[in-house]
Amino acid sequence: MNQVYFLDIFMFVFVLQFLFYFKEGMLNTLVKKFLNSLVGVFSYSNTLPLSSVISVFTFIILLTCCFGGYFTYSFCPCGMVEFTFVYAAVAWLSTLLTFISSEKFSVYMSKPGDTYLKTLSMLLVEIVSEFSRPLALTVRLTVNIMVGHLISMMLYQGLELSMGDQYVWLSIFAIMMECFVFFIQSYIFSRLIFLYLNE
């Protein structure tokens, strides 16, 4: 049941070619408008020009994972701790390496006029704060996706028990609620990565 078959990969690649290889057409126009609106939503920083691109890329990858897993296997991979932890660790590591390579890192670690004890204690606090971020990102995304899934399924089951199972719109409503949760959680995760990059 949880196996990936050749036809699944073939269909995924087949659909991807329509998204990325069309030079002109309605689908290409819609994708461009969607991407431009995402760059507007994530804003643009003069100090770190690629931060919005990284956030938009993270948002699109998370949405693809959420929708791809949900509509093919009825389970979102972002609800699995393993997938979310690896993705959060990679995203956090990119923000950490960007921060370390900047000039702010040396100024941030030793401020002029501070005593050695204060610098050491602040360094320990900052290290704990920095290394707890991937765990916080993992827990936040996994728990919110799972809670959103459980709430929408409980609402669906409750409405189905009270109204009967002849209403198709109840299942459509539950699917739309799940999709809304996917959008919100992907946005929050990518926005946090954007904020980590702009520190």
UniProtKB/Swiss-Prot annotation:
Effect of S51G: In strain: VT847
Transmembrane segments: 2-22, 53-73, 80-100, 141-161, 169-189
Gene Ontology terms: cellular component: mitochondrial inner membrane; proton-transporting ATP synthase complex
Main location: mitochondrion
Membrane topology summary: Multi-pass membrane protein
Gene: atp6
Any one of the GO BP annotations: proton motive force-driven ATP synthesis
Family: Belongs to the ATPase A chain family.
Superkingdom field: Eukaryota
PROSITE patterns the UniProt entry points to: ATPASE_A
One of the record's GO molecular function terms: proton transmembrane transporter activity
Subcellular compartments: Mitochondrion inner membrane
InterPro entries: ATP_synth_F0_asu, ATP_synth_F0_asu_AS, ATP_synth_F0_asu_bact/mt, F0_ATP_A_sf
Function: Mitochondrial membrane ATP synthase (F(1)F(0) ATP synthase or Complex V) produces ATP from ADP in the presence of a proton gradient across the membrane which is generated by electron transport complexes of the respiratory chain. F-type ATPases consist of two structural domains, F(1) - containing the extramembraneous catalytic core and F(0) - containing the membrane proton channel, linked together by a central stalk and a peripheral stalk. During catalysis, ATP synthesis in the catalytic domain of F(1) is coupled via a rotary mechanism of the central stalk subunits to proton translocation.
Subunit field text: F-type ATPases have 2 components, CF(1) - the catalytic core - and CF(0) - the membrane proton channel. CF(1) has five subunits: alpha(3), beta(3), gamma(1), delta(1), epsilon(1). CF(0) has three main subunits: a, b and c.
Name of this protein: ATP synthase subunit a
Annotated keywords: ATP synthesis, CF(0), Hydrogen ion transport, Ion transport, Membrane, Mitochondrion, Mitochondrion inner membrane, Transmembrane, Transmembrane helix, Transport
